[in-house]
A protein has these predicted regions:
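Extracytoplasmic "Venus flytrap"
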Residues: 40-59, 80-87, 185, 309-313
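C-terminal segment of N-terminal export signals and the immediately downstream linker at the start
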Residues: 1, 23-44
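N-terminal export signals
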Residues: 6-27
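Signal peptide-proximal N-terminal region
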Residues: 57-79
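Solvent-exposed, acidic/polar segments of extracytosolic/periplasmic ligand-binding ectodomains
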Residues: 351-418
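Extracellular/periplasmic bilobed ligand-binding domains
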Residues: 122, 189-282
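Extracellular/periplasmic periplasmic-binding protein-like sensory domains
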Residues: 246-317, 329-330, 395-403, 407-415
Length: 418
């Protein structure tokens, strides 16, 4: 435990900054002079996590409906479906919202690499676009330089980088990454490997093959033969569930197990049961966070939807709240330039803590949390226990410079939206 505290101290100075202000401190009411502002929203689908698209929309509506802005028809949300977020469907939907619906601002869940294929539309039309996704890709320079693009993500590749540094300094220099062809098709593998290297650690990668009966057995055999100091499970869906259950139950392994933040989602933990206890991750948010902005959000979301919020609900709510604040601060000037300036200057306390955009890149800056999953009371489902990392790492940090290249490959859909 002392090592854990030392790691937190090394990364920063405490949680006070993340809880300093109530959510709506200093926010003026939106005044539209009887005009209805149009917000375009791109929504993909997911077979892995079918609830995620609806969670995001529910959260967004809750966040943007400050002072009953939707019910008063000050704001209208126009939603376009984009399938799995392919370039063709996404471009068609974006063009429709921009040129037929004439939206004032766009948001939604879309892969960063797909956005890069039609990012010039937003500069031509002078309409801000708040891109949301799990944070699977590094922001290449053309995206960072577009004054009408803003990115609010769940920081997946930063999480992987920080997890590697944590694991290497706490458990040993030799790590094993267990992933799949799908899960490895983004920047998280590189980020984890590079994070370990920065702490003079090494990593090996085992790729599980979906639909192959003995693929998990092969991975477990590899773990036994290589004897790593820790394992990082960069997996999702059924493959993640099978690997974790067998890793814990068949091997009775006491090896430290790191995983992606999405393992901490309630619907996933219930399928793992006691096998989830002891998993560690670095997550963007947890509904178990004990600070006012998060507690208020969880309460309001439950009252509105009769369900607990997941990470996508939080991301949607945060984006909706951000959008309302930006609109309200424009003082009636809803031009794209005015809105982009309002977003770039935005400062607020969201459910995950202090929120702002990096003024040079348009990428959200938010806290992250070292999260351990502990056994539930009376053998109930294990619960995440988050501790703030007072310093995160910027999306465009020099540690990721090797990713800043137009010669990129990988999946185009947002992570988990497949």
């Amino acid at each position: 435990m002392s090592n854990r505290r030392n790691f937190l101290k090394i990364l920063g100075t405490g949680m006070a900054a993340a809880t300093a202000n109530p959510v709506l401190a200093g926010v003026s009411r939106l005044k539209t002079d009887h005009r209805t502002l149009k917000i375009g929203l791109l929504s993909p689908q997911s077979n892995l996590f079918p609830a995620y698209p609806y969670s995001f929309i529910n959260g967004f509506r809750l966040g943007i409906d400050q002072h009953q802005a939707l019910r008063k028809k000050q704001i209208e949300i126009i939603t376009e479906q984009v399938g799995y977020g392919t370039p063709f469907l996404s471009t068609q939907a974006a063009r429709k919202l921009l040129y037929e619906n004439n939206v004032d601002l766009m948001t939604g869940i879309l892969g960063t690499e797909v956005v890069s294929q039609f990012s010039d539309l937003f500069q031509q039309k002078e309409v801000p676009f708040i891109v949301c996704n799990p944070g699977e890709y590094f922001p290449v320079e053309p995206l960072r330089k577009n004054p009408f693009l803003f990115f609010n993500t769940l920081n997946l590749y930063q999480s992987s980088f920080l997890q590697a540094r944590y694991a290497t300094t706490h458990y040993g220099k030799k790590g094993l990454i267990v992933t799949s062809l799908y899960d490895s098709g983004y920047d998280a593998v590189y980020a984890f490997t590079h994070g370990a290297e920065m702490e003079e650690g090494t990593t090996e990668v085992v790729i599980l093959r979906q639909g192959t009966a003995d693929t998990v057995s092969e991975a477990l055999s590899r773990i036994r033969s290589t004897a790593p100091d820790y394992v990082y499970a960069l997996l999702s869906g059924d493959l993640a569930r099978e690997f974790i259950l067998r890793f814990r139950n068949e091997e009775n392994s006491s090896l430290p197990l790191m995983a992606t933040p999405f393992v901490t989602e309630e619907h996933f933990l219930t399928t793992l049961g006691a096998s989830a206890a002891g998993i560690e991750t670095i997550a963007p948010w947890s509904r178990h966070l004990d600070h006012p902005a998060s507690l208020d959000f969880v309460k309001n979301y439950r009252e509105t939807t009769r369900s607990n919020p997941d990470m996508m609900a939080m991301l949607g709510y945060e984006t909706g709240l951000l959008t309302y604040r930006a609109l309200a601060s424009c003082n009636g000037d809803f031009s794209g330039t005015s809105l982009a300036h309002a977003l770039r200057e935005a400062r607020m306390t969201s459910p995950r803590g202090d929120f702002s955009f990096d003024p040079e890149t348009g990428w959200a800056q938010t806290p992250m949390y070292l999260t351990s999953i502990r056994a539930g009371l009376f053998n109930l489902t294990p619960e995440p226990h988050p501790e703030v990392l007072p310093q995160s790492i910027a999306a465009h940090d020099l540690a990721f410079a090797a990713l800043d290249t137009p010669l990129r490959s990988g999946w185009l859909n947002p992570y988990l939206f497949v």
